[in-house]
Amino acid sequence: MVRIAIAGAAGRMGRNLVKATHQNPLSELGAGSERPESSLVGVDIGELCGIGKQGIVLVDNLEQAVEQFDVIIDFTAPASTLANLALCEQHGKKLVIGTTGFTDAQRQTIEQAAKKIPIVMAPNYSVGVNLVFKLLEKAAKVMGDYCDIEIIEAHHRHKVDAPSGTAIGMGEAIAHAMGNQLSDVAVYAREGITGERSRNEIGFATIRAGDIIGEHTAMFADIGERVEITHKATDRMTFANGAVKAAIWLAEQPAGFYTMIDVLGLNDL
């Protein structure tokens, strides 16, 4: 049984992670944390998340419960995730990262830590999205040289980073399949007189509205035809169940930097 701690357990995603951990027969809830200023610190996590009293209360720092878990699942914010990364390094714990919006320097810090501890980091933990990443690699190799490529993503009004980590992951899959770095070909905004579109660029469009959980489309457009590969999420439990699956898988892995592609065994697809 893998003991899991949920960072940000009182948030929208955190509550789903608590439920997914509780429902999976291979995992159990070990701890949960919230920001120190939260009025929910000290509340029973199970009662908060609707799974019944668990005898585990929210703490404001997972170090207070470090003996109660093997893996942290963190879908919070970059600064909070990096603090939990340091905790995992210090105590030999494992870390599943669903947080997005890291700078290049912060990502390098995570990759460096993975030399000491096992880490799974992915922009999206749904099986469907990770299959889409592989499909995009195939499509890019066939159509990338002659099609215009655009990525459109939509999320709820509360999402704070743009484009989404999943959209960037889609762009990276396409760019790498074509032998490019995304940073060299990405166009994140168009306004005014932009001139003609260059052949190699990958365009991004972002929508923030209502309660959209997550929708992503990659478009390969040629003259006379267009191929679109789309994923639509309708329930956050999709991501939560995938993250718990990753935590259970990670518990048996040596130190290293892994993605959901590794967890699902899709590398050879």
UniProtKB/Swiss-Prot annotation:
The active site is at H155, K159. It is found in: Cytoplasm. Belongs to the DapB family. GO terms for biological process: diaminopimelate biosynthetic process; lysine biosynthetic process via diaminopimelate. GO terms for cellular component: cytosol. PROSITE patterns: DAPB. Catalyzes the conversion of 4-hydroxy-tetrahydrodipicolinate (HTPA) to tetrahydrodipicolinate. Its main location: cytoplasm. This is 4-hydroxy-tetrahydrodipicolinate reductase. Its EC number is 1.17.1.8. NCBIfam families: dapB (TIGR00036). Keywords: Amino-acid biosynthesis, Cytoplasm, Diaminopimelate biosynthesis, Lysine biosynthesis, NAD, NADP, Oxidoreductase. NAD(+) binds at G8, A9, A10, G11, R12, M13, E34, G98, T99, T100, A122, P123, N124, Y125. (S)-2,3,4,5-tetrahydrodipicolinate binds at H156, G165, T166.
